[in-house]
Amino acid sequence: MNPRIETLQTLTYEVTGAIARIILNRPERGNGITLEMPRELAACVERANLDPDVHVIALAGNGSGFCGGYDLIASAEHDMEGIAQPDAPEGSPLDPMVQARNHDPSGTWDPVTDYQMMSRNLRGFMSLFHSEKPTVCKVHGYCVAGGTDMALCSDLLVVEDTAKIGYPPARVWGVPTSALWAYRVGPARAKRLLLTGDSIDGTTAAEWGLASEVAPAAELDERFESLLERIGRVPINQLVMHKLLVNQTLYSQGLQATQAMGVFFDGIARHTPEGFAWQQLAAEKGFKEAVRERDEPFGDVGLG
């Protein structure tokens, strides 16, 4: 009997044996992050943690890549109708209309409203990190911008050798809210990426210690499944204790305070003079053209 795949608004969930599988499922938009995705992610992670049959949580993306970051076309172009979501609590920080008004260059920016939204998104991503059970992320194609928040919040990465991983919004209009780059690759390499907005391929990610496994596309699924199966053989109690033990190292290094700064800085980055200018460019010429003009001088147009 085949396991039943449950389809939510932004992802799918299923359990096969000892593995809970969460698949980002917006391939037509590059699995772009919406306000709903972090909350659905957290709900699925909690469900897996409460399932006595699940030992390990697998995260992957449907389509040509893992995740291209936030789905910003409507918001960056200030298309109020394009981002309306009738199921969002009206007037709340999660109401896209509230956030659209808060990003209007002609209006007044409320940093607390911004923080309330982005901190909740971060909580959703960090559910992978806080999960008692281990989380393993498969990266293929592209994993850029906000997509790296989900990947870096996972315990282990299995990546395609040619995958592109990075944070291009470091050039304008963004700061990584998870603030995990320095913890995952060290301060010097984190600065190398964030001070340029450059990306690395999967092979480099493995060399830097960011990825635990790397494989060509034809072998990626096999390598991913092999690791999941090995983890799935370990008793849940052992997995929980060892993950908590290692995570405590990051807690003691000030991760929570660093992330609070990352969330605030991300909001500020979207409201600096150059941030407003870039948003105005997106409103006038379209989001894709604004990204092209941002990235073309660096020779890597189209990475996020």
Language-model region placement:
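Terminal peptide-recognition signature
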Residues: 22, 26, 40-41, 59, ...
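Glycine- (often His-adjacent) and acidic-residue-rich active-site loop
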Residues: 61-123
